[in-house]
Amino acid sequence: MKLRYLFILLIILAVTSVFIGVEDLSPLDLFDLSKQEASTLFASRLPRLISIVIAGLSMSICGLIMQQISRNKFVSPTTAGTMDWARLGILISLLLFTSASPLIKMLVAFVFALAGNFLFMKILERIKFNDTIFIPLVGLMLGNIVSSIATFIAYKYDLIQNVSSWLQGDFSLVVKGRYELLYLSIPLVIIAYVYADKFTLAGMGESFSVNLGLKYKRVVNIGLIIVSLITSLVILTVGMLPFLGLIIPNIVSIYRGDNLKSSLPHTVLLGAVFVLFCDILGRIIIFPYEISIGLMVGIIGSGIFLFMLLRRKAYA
């Protein structure tokens, strides 16, 4: 699919998203907004749209980076346990700093997510798997262990409601003043694009990339830092978006190949389009109620993930 088609589709979905909701708002109202309509548009609908686009494109890039540096098409922040580590970090920040600002929570979540990513990569270095499918299974098992620890702590200290809010991604609570931290993902996306060629070289293996003059460890560490920061920002702001970083890069690689700089713009747009589509679908299925974006992405994403597992020889 060409970039211009993805961009046009994104614009169509974005405009549609602005006018879907319990509060009536039509395109004609834009020419003469009442105080209530202006509040709905600028305090709720536009912040929600912006957060959807940023979360979708940034989490898709996270998956693309992780698949490159791990050299496995089934690795993503979901299957590597990164999201579970970030959630545990947020929970720990609530215990240690009861009145912590969102920035402090994000930093603690980042430290935990980064530690989890390093642990996952160390496991991959120490254990060589003949079948590529075992690598994400290790990440999923590790993530389940971390998730169980987080749930235990949450029950022990009566924080289970907080954990549940991050377990299912939800854009319904995104309003002006509660999503701006996501803007920090934008410079990280730019850095990812600058390092795109280096990530592509790193995906060829340590010995090969070092022979080409690449500082392999440094590039891998930068990639893990970008992934950990973005994951922490997204989970803290909107919650978990499972399988997003897994399916979007794989879909793009089918028709764009594995060159990261070439596939990154398509990954960005397709990620935003996919999340926006899932959000709109979740808002209209049981209107005026809505299904959380985490559930919609999880259902559709897990279906695509299962399909890729069945076709793993084609994607490995």
Swiss-Prot record:
What GO molecular functions are on record for this protein?
transmembrane transporter activity
Q: Pfam families of this UniProt entry? A: FecCD
Broad class of where this protein is predominantly found: membrane
List all membrane-crossing ranges: 5-25, 49-69, 94-114, 133-153, 181-201, 224-244, 268-288, 290-310
**Membrane-topology annotation of the record:** Multi-pass membrane protein
Q: How does it assemble?
A: The complex is composed of two ATP-binding proteins (YclP), two transmembrane proteins (YclN and YclO) and a solute-binding protein (YclQ).
From the Swiss-Prot or TrEMBL record, give the protein name: Petrobactin import system permease protein YclN
